A protein has these predicted regions:
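Short-chain dehydrogenase/reductase
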Residues: 40-51, 78-85, 108-109, 157
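Aromatic/hydrophobic pocket-lining residues that form π-stacking "cages" and hydrophobic walls in ligand
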Residues: 1, 54, 86-87, 164
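Active-site proximal helix/loop that lines the substrate pocket
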Residues: 18-21, 72-78, 104, 157
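Short aromatic-enriched loop/helix-cap "lid" or pocket-rim segments at secondary-structure transitions
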Residues: 26-28, 78-81, 112, 163-164
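C-terminal substrate-binding subdomain of Rossmann-fold SDR/epimerase-dehydratase oxidoreductases
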Residues: 91-226
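N-terminal Rossmann-like NAD(P)+-binding domain of SDR-like oxidoreductases, especially those catalyzing
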Residues: 1-73, 122-123, 203, 207, ...
Length: 226
């Protein structure tokens, strides 16, 4: 469909990438100037491939493309397979929750409203070719094609156990926890460098985990009538 649209005057293609592309990177915060050549999961590899395909379309057909690397999105209408949804459901059903790596990990949790706000603002920031860019000296987030990549994250990594504490406060009960080893393909920490995003659109995600988790629990209880 993208190839078809390329012949129909597409002004700007925005697409969802992921913080997962940073894979084995250890330098914090994760920067779009850093290489992302070592994914640790198939999901991460597909997101990297997504960015490569976008760049190819930008180069071949001149389609302006912007990749947005989302960092651990959560909030109302979230995916049922994500931790917050599964934890909330289990707690309200009186079941234990599975806590991986014994809770010793951090995530840059980003509330859905902040993600949407950033996307809306990015629509009008149409990337232009950078004539000074070279493979040898240029940033991976930039190109001689009309192509850009940005992080969208809260820039405040939170310990998983603190995230669970915020959920316990919102639900009004203490979770029974199954402490388990880390899952294959998981990483210990994520943290977003959002300065390029702020420079482009004057916005940084700012919803706190405590407020965002409460919003989710309020929605969950109302939607599922529990």
């Amino acid at each position: 469909r993208v190839l078809f649209r390329s012949h129909n005057n597409v002004e700007h293609l925005l697409y969802a990438s992921s913080s997962s592309v940073y894979g084995l990177n250890r330098k914090m915060p994760f920067s779009t100037d850093d290489s992302v050549d070592h994914p640790v999961s198939l999901y991460a590899a597909t997101k990297k491939a997504n960015e490569l395909m976008a760049h190819t379309y930008s180069h071949l057909y001149g389609i302006p493309t912007t990749g947005l690397r989302f960092f651990t999105v959560y909030g109302p209408w979230g995916r049922p397979d994500m931790a917050l949804f599964k934890f909330t459901k289990a707690m309200l059903e009186g079941k234990p929750i599975d806590v991986y790596n014994y809770g010793k990990m951090k995530r840059d949790f980003t509330y859905i409203d902040d993600i949407v706000e950033a996307i809306v603002r990015m629509q009008d920031i149409i990337p232009q070719p950078n004539p000074e860019w070279t493979v040898e000296t240029g940033s991976p987030a930039d190109s001689s094609a009309p192509y850009r990549v940005y992080n969208i994250g809260n820039s405040s990594p939170v310990e998983l156990m603190d995230y669970i504490t915020a959920l316990e406060e919102a639900v009004g009960m203490v979770a029974e926890k199954n402490m388990m080893p880390i899952q294959p393909g998981d990483v210990l920490e994520t943290s977003a460098d959002t300065k390029p995003l702020y420079d482009a659109v004057g916005f940084r995600p700012q919803t706190t985990v405590r407020q965002g988790v409460k919003n989710f629990v309020d929605w969950y209880k109302a939607y599922y009538k529990v």
